[in-house]
Amino acid sequence: MKPFTVLNGIAALLDRPNVDTDQIIPKQFLRKIERTGFGVHLFHDWRYLDDAGTKLNPEFSLNQERYKGASILLTRDNFGCGSSREHAPWALEDYGFRSIIAPSYADIFFNNCFKNGMLPVVLKSEEVEELFRFVSGNVGAKLQIDLDKQTVTGPTGKVYTFEVDSFRKYCLYNGLDDIGLTLKQGSKIGEFEKKQKEVEPWLYVI
């Protein structure tokens, strides 16, 4: 998992509350367990005018030239609601997003973001509204998200602070998912298995 330290990136606006996981990545695309290849289907029903995904909807924000290469998604309340699917953060990350900023998230989606190397930032509604105004009024506007300082710096230089659990912060900062955390305990696992083989050898009979 790629470490998250400081992110300087273009912010794309998705001015919709209650965006559910079936809008983030529709169910018909959940046909594999690899994490890649989902970005093209992100927000499929909004991005495209046809089911085949060949005709872009020029009215959808992410299709606008000004948001090309965006790595931060600025959106509204209750983002990621609906059914649980880890493919949702996979699709966002595969598209190019490393962080989301919103006033609130659905709990399961919020947790899945951290497990997949994405930082879901929670700011007050009025702070998100202020960032919406700044970004919409400035083409190519960039934000800076500093995980260590737990700050978001807007286009005008104004700084916003956010909270993040210390363990999740450690994992993101060091690029550690559940597998990475387990591998860090490799020597202890090896010692345990060695002792277990001595006292319970039948467990290792093939």
From Swiss-Prot:
Pathway: Amino-acid biosynthesis; L-leucine biosynthesis; L-leucine from 3-methyl-2-oxobutanoate: step 2/4. One of its GO terms (biological process) is L-leucine biosynthetic process. It catalyses: (2R,3S)-3-isopropylmalate = (2S)-2-isopropylmalate. SUPFAM superfamilies: LeuD/IlvD-like. One of its GO terms (cellular component) is 3-isopropylmalate dehydratase complex. It is an enzyme of class 4 (lyase). The keyword Amino-acid biosynthesis applies. Catalyzes the isomerization between 2-isopropylmalate and 3-isopropylmalate, via the formation of 2-isopropylmaleate. Belongs to the LeuD family. LeuD type 1 subfamily. Heterodimer of LeuC and LeuD. This is 3-isopropylmalate dehydratase small subunit. It comes from Leptospira borgpetersenii serovar Hardjo-bovis (strain JB197). The lineage of its organism: Bacteria, Pseudomonadati, Spirochaetota, Spirochaetia, Leptospirales. The gene is leuD.
